[in-house]
Curated annotation (Swiss-Prot):
Keywords: Nucleus
Biased composition (Basic residues): 244-253
PANTHER family registered for this protein in UniProt: PAK4-INHIBITOR INKA1-RELATED, PAK4-INHIBITOR INKA2
GO molecular function, one term: protein serine/threonine kinase inhibitor activity
Chain positions covered by the region annotation Disordered: 82-109, 175-200, 234-285
Domain notes: The Inka box (also named iBox or inca box) binds and inhibits PAK4 by binding a substrate-like manner.
Organism: Homo sapiens (Human)
Gene it is expressed from: INKA2
Compartment(s): Nucleus
Highest taxon, organism lineage: Eukaryota
Name the record gives this protein: PAK4-inhibitor INKA2
């Protein structure tokens, strides 16, 4: 009994030590989680502040008589939530919370949750302002391919549709003048209205121009090839077909002479078959189907 009691005491001590170590680890994790939550809430506040600054810049700047106009409009929903007028000052860029103040985290979270709600209401104005010049002058190369073709001719696609599309796209005229006009028009507007969609469209147009120049350098020159090798564009399909029909006709004649060794039957075949077989071969060759080719090839 004494040995068992000693073993039980040892096990209990080990359990107590493990519980103490787990408690210490849990306290450390709790502190780390608190620090991470504080950092996330500060990031949210910074996001709200940058969004407000972008809205102020995109709005063309406040009226000289009221410098705090756009900011007060964004702060009205905070007052409607039942909080005092001193709470919305957290949204201003001048006030920055510290990392050590862990007691203010719930208030920051509530302020962030209420400040993020009115932002989508005011952002459509910015998106509409950004979509305005894009609707007037689209940068999509497919629309230019369909509408701004060479000599305003309809788009004709052959067997290899992708190759025809790329060829027609390479034949399109350059749109550098339109881009310069867009840049001069955008210079009059404030800098804040140049959003991410316009920047992405500009970068895509730049990469498309580089790709187009590369393909034009790789593509063979048709005029030079026509001078060196005239007639390389149009393959001689009818001549090959007629040559094939003549070869098959010779084969059939030689085969016929082998099957009919008697002179009477040979003369009978020579007298009757040539006027009938030659017109048939000449008639069926342009259609692309020949009986002789179906038999022997």
């Amino acid at each position: 009994m004494t040995m068992e009691s000693r073993e039980m005491d040892c096990y209990l001590r080990r359990l107590k030590q493990e519980l103490m170590s787990m408690k210490e680890v849990g306290d450390g994790l709790q502190d780390q989680m608190n620090c991470m939550m504080g950092a996330l809430q500060e990031l949210k506040l910074l996001q709200v502040q940058t969004a407000l600054e972008q809205l102020e810049i995109s709005g063309g700047g406040p009226v000289p008589g009221s410098p705090e106009g756009p900011r007060t409009q964004c702060e009205h929903p905070c007052w409607e939530g039942g909080r005092g007028p001193a709470r919305p000052t957290v949204c201003s860029p001048s006030s920055q919370p510290s990392l050590g103040s862990s007691t203010k985290f719930p208030s920051h979270r509530s302020v962030c949750g209420r400040d993020l709600a009115p932002l989508p209401r005011t952002q459509p104005h910015q998106s509409c302002a950004q979509q305005g010049p894009e609707r007037v002058e689209p940068d999509d190369w497919t629309s230019t391919l369909m509408s701004r073709g060479r000599n305003r001719q309809p788009l004709v696609l052959g067997d290899n549709v992708f190759a025809d599309l790329v060829g027609n796209w390479l034949d399109l005229p350059e749109l550098e003048k339109g881009g310069e006009k867009g840049e001069t028009g955008g210079a009059r507007e404030p800098k804040g209205e140049k959003g991410q969609p316009q920047e992405l469209g500009r970068r895509f147009a730049l990469t498309a121009n580089i790709f187009k120049k590369f393909l034009r350098s790789v593509r063979p020159d048709r005029d030079r090839l026509l001078k060196e090798k005239p007639g390389w564009v149009t393959p001689m399909v009818p001549e090959s077909r007629t040559g094939r029909s003549q070869k098959v006709k010779k084969r059939s004649l030689s085969k016929g002479s082998g099957h009919f060794p008697f002179p009477g039957t040979g003369e009978h075949r020579r007298g009757e078959n040539p006027p009938t077989s030659c017109p048939k071969a000449l008639e069926h060759s342009p259609s692309g189907f020949d009986i002789n080719t179906a038999v022997w090839v």
